[in-house]
Structures are given as C-alpha cells and as structure tokens.
C-alpha cells in the first residue's frame, strides 16, 4: 500500500494555484483527454471558470491532499435550493477525480463519503 494512504488527509477549497493540477486531473481519462486542454500556459477560460465558481456561494471546488501537500484528487459540489422539507439545499457531486498515482487505493470512496457528509 502506498505510504500516502496512511498520512493525514486534508480536504480544502481549491485556490487559483491549484487550477493546473485540477485541469490535469480532468484531462487524465479517455473523455477528458479529448475535451480538456492541458497545455501550459492554460487557456484563460479555465481561470475565468474558476473565478465564477469561487464567486458563486452555491459552488465549491474541493481538493484532497495528503500531509505532504500532494494533490490526491478533486471534486466539485453544487448546492441546489429546493422547496421540499420546507426549503433547503441538496448537493450535486461532480467532477470527482483521483490522481492516477493514487487510484485503486480507496481515495475515490473517501472523497464521496466526505462529500456526502458535507
């Protein structure tokens, strides 16, 4: 088992310097490799989208990292208002990604469990 699995895991909101790593995660699968543009420098559209996410109180872009500050994965949460239960929020979990170095070690499950508790 990878040593990183047992280290402290930190879930935090993404910051602008994370954008290249997030795009790299998004591009690292069959579909993402066809739709994402992971070329340095990144297109401004990624930075514009990030700013829109940050400014929207119903959006959270989350990073999972270990105590060595290695990015293990990411996800986006969208909070959607609804009327049932006298009004409230439900969340949509999307763009869950795990770095290929950490796949097959249970991190995707940890990300989803964290998001559900959130």
Q: What is the predicted role of each segment?
A:
Residues 27-49:
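Conserved GNAT-fold acetyl-CoA-binding loop/helix
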Residues 9, 69-74, 91:
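Glycine-rich phosphate/pyrophosphate-binding loop shared by adenosine-nucleotide-utilizing enzymes
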Residues 51-63, 92:
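A short helix-loop-beta-strand connector motif used in the catalytic cores of GNAT acetyltransferases and
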Residues 10-24:
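A short beta-loop-alpha structural element at the N-terminal edge
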Residues 102, 106-114:
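Conserved acetyl-CoA pyrophosphate-binding loop and the N-cap/start of the following alpha-helix
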Residues 75-94:
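Conserved donor-binding loop and adjoining core beta-sheet/short helix segment
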Residues 65, 81, 93-103:
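A short, internal acetyl-CoA/4′-phosphopantetheine-binding micro-motif in the GNAT/acyltransferase core
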Residues 63, 70-79, 97:
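Conserved beta-strand in the GNAT
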